[in-house]
């Protein structure tokens, strides 16, 4: 009980401090602050309610006694990850709490296992040792330090123990104080940003030093240099006398005292030192009705040392004429987009009137003695690839606004950055009302200045003495000059006859060739040689869309677009017409059976043919080029013959009951059957043998996937083939015509194709030659036995079942 009473006594003692909100003072001085205005304070009732909710959640998660079973900070961290904080946040009816707020309040303040307060020497040593072991993995580090969370460990190391904060405890010099004040002017109270530019000064140290400076200035204890630096950029007139240490009320900060009252305050302080309730910070008359003047370097700061009343919109004068080309604007004399800013006499005046100015925009340094009159001449002839005479203009075009208007707009935002209201500022009364509302409800005001300059393009254009063109900057409707892109001129212009160096335009012949090139490239069979993708050792007459003539380019010169094309596509200049065997060339010359070099394996790179050998009309050069670019190891898999042979061999070596079709060599059989089936169109193939008569249902299962015209290609199924191979005297299946029994029977070999030249694998067969020989020998044996059996059946009229056979598979 004594401990609890001691804590209560400590809490009951008044806190020693300045008695005023330093952030409010900073804001009143005109500095930008980044306060979390939407933060909700936690009362004792809210804390007790959160404790009970967490205790109930712990019991639901398996802790029988609730929080009493949570002994370590690691267990607390595990518990906090399992609790549904969004559900707990909905239990707070009177205040708006998010799941993040509830979780942060528990883990950062109310957790009984959380250790708060100063770090001991032992904890610092443990932190340094854990950092050497784990690095910046703060969760692992917190596991080695009991009672400290990962956030506490990270903050302690970065702010105090890290190498970047070794000099944080050294004395602040006057130079550092002034540097800190300038950083706060530039960035506001973004302490991490400020500390990144301060040597060995962590963010926490910078914040504490700023608070001390403000406190000393308010109390009159700061030096004249610091006080002047603080007040230099602001519109608040602080008292010269020493300020007392009495707590400053909000009404005192927002006091509307007059200069006469300020003098009375100074006299009263001298005459009556015990006066305690007087204004400490005095604002000049009509503070809220004064419009802040924007400076060049400070950006949109709402205060100035010399306040200026808001002028009526009608009295705002238009900015002076600007005789320069700004970034992104269009030059009226030549329709040339320029990024060159001309030095003018009134540039400083223009920057004063425009917020921010364009001083930081990229500029191009001009040569000495360069006047604005030669801007167009400089732009037309600098970095040019031509030696054409320079264009001189008789007059200088200036850009003067026809009309200008200025608008002041405001946006009122709450603490969370959400827009509440916005509109146009048209009176000082509205400004005063905005300031009062912002102070009353802790709102933010954003002021925007909009200057609208309306320019009129001049109708008269200077005429060039050489070309007589009214618009020298426009070439074929394109506002971009070739001079503005010298690298493009080097790529397209060197050695190309279409680019005329005198006029920097495309002649009609070259323009026609470009149009043809586009149409060829987008056609069904594009002509890739228009882009010089292939070597040019062939006759130039074969390619009508080639850029330029052969006299202007060497044969082995690198391509404009693909310089490495010659190394990828070597020229096959020794090809002749006789090298293409028409018997082996199918409709698609990309087939692996296409022998381009007298039976040798076709090359994967040599793709060009001579002028006399024409490709089949349905094969476009794009398909040939695509095939020739493939590696040699992939090319054999693209042909239909190799894929079919590989699939048939796989089915033959690994049969399955579901495979009911036979894919033998069908090319010759189809030709023979067509000659026979032409006489019997209505006949259907019925498969018979001496062991079993297959009924109509079995025939329907062995038909092909296509319609009846393709049924003559189908043979027996796998089980019939297996039975015929297992018998001592097997009879091969015979196809007979249903209408004409006297027709010549035709033997069908299941799954075994005759080894002919058309179906051979050629040079790509590889390891399949051995299997093909075995299959061919078996096919010849079955063929001879089939002839003997057919002759025996015709003479004897039938035979008995004497051989041992496999039972019929009912499936």
UniProtKB/Swiss-Prot annotation:
Residues 34-110 form the Myb-like domain. GO terms for cellular component: nucleus. Residues 237-320, 348-379, 535-713, 782-811 are annotated as: Disordered. Pfam families: Myb_DNA-binding (PF00249). Gene3D superfamilies: Homeodomain-like (1.10.10.60). One of its GO terms (molecular function) is RNA polymerase II cis-regulatory region sequence-specific DNA binding. Residues 138-161, 191-214 bind DNA. Residues 111-165, 166-218 form the HTH myb-type domain. The keyword DNA damage does not apply. Residues 265-275 have a biased composition (Low complexity). Keywords: Activator, DNA-binding, Nucleus, Repeat, Transcription, Transcription regulation. Monomer. It comes from Saccharomyces cerevisiae (strain ATCC 204508 / S288c) (Baker's yeast). This is Myb-like DNA-binding protein BAS1. InterPro entries: Homeodomain-like_sf, Myb-like_DNA-bd, Myb_dom, SANT/Myb, SANT_dom. Present with 861 molecules/cell in log phase SD medium. Disulfide bonds: none annotated. One of its GO terms (biological process) is positive regulation of transcription by RNA polymerase II. Residues 348-366, 535-613, 653-664 have a biased composition (Polar residues). Residues 237-264, 282-298, 782-794 have a biased composition (Basic and acidic residues).
